[in-house]
């Protein structure tokens, strides 16, 4: 069985994808819900997913075409942190809001001018969190090269 079919079956069997009436973070109503934050509870499948993303990036984007991964908490960050470790690339993450304590930053990680960044997100409905993250990064004089979403 190829990875996509095997992974979809796993998501269904472990109730990571559920069917019913759901209201998503964007406010959109959906007949299904995917909670990829549960995948690290299944380390073998989690590693397969990370490896599959690594292969996709190698073949379709090329590791030489970006400097760092960027993501948003929480779902995307879970994936991006493991992926960054596997491909040995830095990781930046963007909070929805700046912290009210410590350094009061919304963007964490080292960003240099003109870095090419690859956005990793777990599930996208309206794209709002990705758009807001890109705006925060652009304020730091950087752009996002490409966005990858698992769903």
Question: Could you tell me what each predicted segment is?
Answer:
Residues 1-151:
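PRPP-associated nucleotide enzymes
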């Amino acid at each position: 069985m190829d990875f996509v079919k095997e992974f979809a079956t796993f998501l269904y069997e472990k109730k990571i994808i559920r069917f019913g009436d759901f209201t998503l973070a964007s406010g959109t109503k959906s007949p299904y819900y995917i909670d990829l934050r549960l995948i690290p509870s299944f380390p073998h499948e989690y590693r397969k997913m990370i490896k599959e993303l690594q292969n996709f990036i190698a073949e379709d984007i090329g590791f030489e075409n970006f400097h760092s991964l960027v993501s948003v908490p929480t779902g995307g960050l879970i994936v991006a942190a493991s992926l960054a470790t596997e491909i040995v690339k830095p990781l930046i993450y963007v909070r929805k809001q700046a912290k009210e304590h410590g350094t009061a930053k919304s963007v964490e990680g080292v960003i240099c001018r003109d870095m090419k960044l690859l956005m990793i997100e777990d599930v996208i409905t309206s794209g709002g969190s990705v758009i807001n993250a890109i705006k925060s990064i652009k304020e730091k004089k950087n752009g996002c090269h490409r966005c990858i979403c698992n769903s």
